[in-house]
Amino acid sequence: LSTLLENVGGLYAALLSDAEIVVPSLGEIGYSGSAGLDVPTLIACLHRHRPESAILLPQLLLALVMAAERGAALPDSLKFLAVGGGRVGETLIARAGAVGLPVFEGYGLSECASVVCLNRPGATRAGSVGRPLQHARVSVRDGELFVEGVRMLGYLGDEVSRHGPVATGDLGHIDDDGFVHITGRRKHLFITAFGRNVSPEWVESELLQHPAFAQAVVHGEARPFNIAIAWLRDPALGDEALRAALDAVNRALPDYARVRDIVRADALFTFADGLLTSNGRPRRDAILARHADAVEACYARHASEPIFFDHLQESAA
């Protein structure tokens, strides 16, 4: 209940609907420390309380989907699982549907009273965060989403204008049917050495849907190719198996967004180590700084490999 989303979506909406609210302890859900999750404990908790609805982060959804794909039985009481707080790949939504999980992706921000958009039964589009709710109006300017309507009063000690649209900092577009699509954060967008814009969240969401990768941060600013710093679900995974996993992910990406190589993280990214925010998002600069030597070594290792311009010069010769 420390987040506005859980208060608005999990508490207030349920109370207004005359629903029962269950708030298990973190231990009962299966959490341990800042990043540990015991999935069987989580599933046992779901069976014990048989909820009809819950709000999940993409990482929790992936854990449930992977468990179900391996034969774990999930409760049939679930009717609406809202997922948000990070980019959710279309493949993960499809996998959730295939194992019978009623997942609906949404989008929001605290400045705009939490939930802004939501897919709903009968109004769902894969790859989108749904249509805006009645209290919000969403527009796009220079690729960035702006929101008008009900909003917060401001931050303590910080004057915030209550007039005009809120610049979300999120990149995206609205399709012809009014569904909003998010591609990443403006401040995280990087430009490769060949002038291609890449939203790292998009590439990371593809990596994290593969069972080999537990955490990943993609880097390619002013570089000839992209790399990812990743913590593997099995840190002992061999190089050949890791290469095969990366190749499988890259097949779903255009050439400019593909990841050339993986830098193995030296430890799980955690809030306690300063590598995650309080809501579980990666602190990119801190992760890059911690692995700077390994990143430079990775780029140096591939420095002699031909790249696009090398092939172009060979063709012209």
Where are these predicted regions, by residue range?
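Conserved AMP-binding/adenylation subdomain of ANL enzymes
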Residues: 2-53, 58-62, 67
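Gly/Ser/Thr-rich phosphate-binding loop
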Residues: 12, 16-20, 51-55, 59, ...
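Conserved C-terminal "lid"/linker of ANL adenylate-forming enzymes
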Residues: 215-218, 250-317
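Conserved ATP/PPi-binding loop(s) of AMP-dependent carboxylate-activating enzymes
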Residues: 128-134, 141-165, 179, 196-198
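Ser/Thr-glycine-rich phosphate-binding loops at phosphate-binding pockets of nucleotides
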Residues: 108-112, 168, 192-193, 277-279
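Alpha-helix/helix-capping structural signal
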Residues: 59-62, 86-87, 91, 150-151, ...
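AMP-binding/adenylate-forming catalytic core of the ANL superfamily
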Residues: 146-148, 171-263, 268-273
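Active-site loops of AMP-binding adenylate-forming
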Residues: 109-127, 150-154, 158-159, 234-236
